[in-house]
UniProtKB/Swiss-Prot annotation:
The gene coding this protein: Mobp
Phosphoserine modified-residue sites: S85, S98, S107
Source organism: Rattus norvegicus (Rat)
Any one Gene Ontology cellular component term annotated for this protein: perinuclear region of cytoplasm
Region (Disordered): 69-170
Any Pfam family: FYVE_2
Biased composition (Low complexity): 82-92, 138-151
UniProt name for this protein: Myelin-associated oligodendrocyte basic protein
Subcellular location: Cytoplasm, Perinuclear region
Role summary: May play a role in compacting or stabilizing the myelin sheath, possibly by binding the negatively charged acidic phospholipids of the cytoplasmic membrane.
Residue numbers spanned by region 3 X 9 AA approximate tandem repeats: 93-119
Tissue specificity statement from the Swiss-Prot or TrEMBL entry: Expressed predominantly in oligodendrocytes, in CNS myelin of the cerebrum and spinal cord. No expression seen in sciatic nerve.
Pro residues composition bias: residue spans: 93-114
UniProt keyword terms in alphabetical order: Cytoplasm, Phosphoprotein, Repeat
Amino acid sequence: MSQKVAKEGPRLSKNQKFSEHFSIHCCPPFTFLNSKREIVDRKYSICKSGCFYQKKEEDWICCACQKTSRRATSPQKPKHQPAASPVVVRAPPAKPKSPPRPAKPRSPPIPAKPRSPSRTERQPRPRPEVRPPPAKQKPPQKSKQPARSSPLRGPGTSRGGSPTRAPRFW
């Protein structure tokens, strides 16, 4: 819904019929239904939270945020600038909006209790008599075969050594 309104800008499309439910958020005059006639009357305006203004003499009070806005704003009072561009609200809404919750003052965080006492405070549990498991006898390992080349002989001609370094047995 908000995407469609953002695309269309401040005016409603012609196929949407005007009703008092289509109205503006706390903002300056607004044009409905491509009529090019700005609605100045606050009767058709609502606040950001979606509630209508009620007229009390010359003051207009927003039902939701209880802000009072005068038709002729005095220079002493700072003007309420809307954060975003005017947004059209469809009514009746599909889901009823819950009223905004009042902000609760934050209490200091409660330190979390440790789940178990520290090891120094904890008494050691009496353990049952612990016996080491019976040692399994390992099968005797086979002795490794000696290396094929004797360290005394050095590399032979067949093993990549030079023929001059090979021992001479002939």
